[in-house]
């Protein structure tokens, strides 16, 4: 893929297609989505700062390969496409005056620099969604994009993008052996999918295996911060509400992410968290309007009750997300950069 291709935002047609899919959703897909919350987000694993300091081992997310997760994302992607987060992640605040999409673009420019790619080199995105981030990273670097994602519907959407090579984007699971040769990729990255890792040591070792010596591994994901106390019921409730709104799995103190890099053999280059409060407020405001509109249209029988129920469930307790970040309990954007040593 050549450099310089203009970054594309979510189009009106994208949103109309997503809306139509939500309006015509089958009973089976509706019931699977609504039931997935109890299956996926009850008693999800946590490791806090206190756990880390007491040497408590990291506990992975056991349902990271489950059919329930696939059913959740089949619908969640459609809901997110109505807003600014078709890429399925909330960006950190790079410029609080800019839109959510513009901050995604600015953050992806940072990631592209971290990856240190040259034109023609191969880069893999774990949890690539429909390939929108991969397309942008490739346009910035001239690298050849690859992607894998658990949700087949999003991979099928990536195949319709003329800027992405169909064979390079596959249904895949980072909780299983990666189907690539040793030392295959020049760089690998993951933006907010890794809370579904079942075994950090396994997944990070697999990334290490398929990465070339000197290659960069960049992640940006959810992390518990110093302030979070799992014994504080108020804080615990805010985190649970945020988990259900943003559909993250495991919740781990940021030092566990750092150790996962080091224990797999990477040199940890940098590790930092960024807030996203202003971005969150923008998106919550938008989805509050959607929720009010859907409720009204459902009441006068212009849209199915199922469609209204989907929006209401997704947007439930959205203010808790804002509060959790303002109280510095978590960030959805803990950003680590690691490098595989040139010589092993």
Regions found by a protein language model. Name each.
Residues 73, 275-325:
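C-terminal helical/coil "lid" or tail adjacent to the Rossmann-like core of SAM-dependent
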Residues 175-188:
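A short acidic, Gly/Pro-enriched loop at the edge of an enzyme's catalytic core
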Residues 4-82:
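N-terminal auxiliary segments of SAM/dcSAM-dependent transferases
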Residues 101-119:
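Conserved alpha-helix/loop element of class I SAM-dependent methyltransferases that forms part
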Residues 249-265:
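Short alpha-helix
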Residues 201-216:
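A short glycine-rich, Lys/Arg-flanked "PGG" loop and its adjoining helix->strand segment in the class I
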Residues 223-249:
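Short, glycine-/aromatic-enriched active-site segment of Class I SAM-dependent methyltransferases
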Residues 133-176:
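Class I SAM-dependent methyltransferase SAM/SAH-binding core
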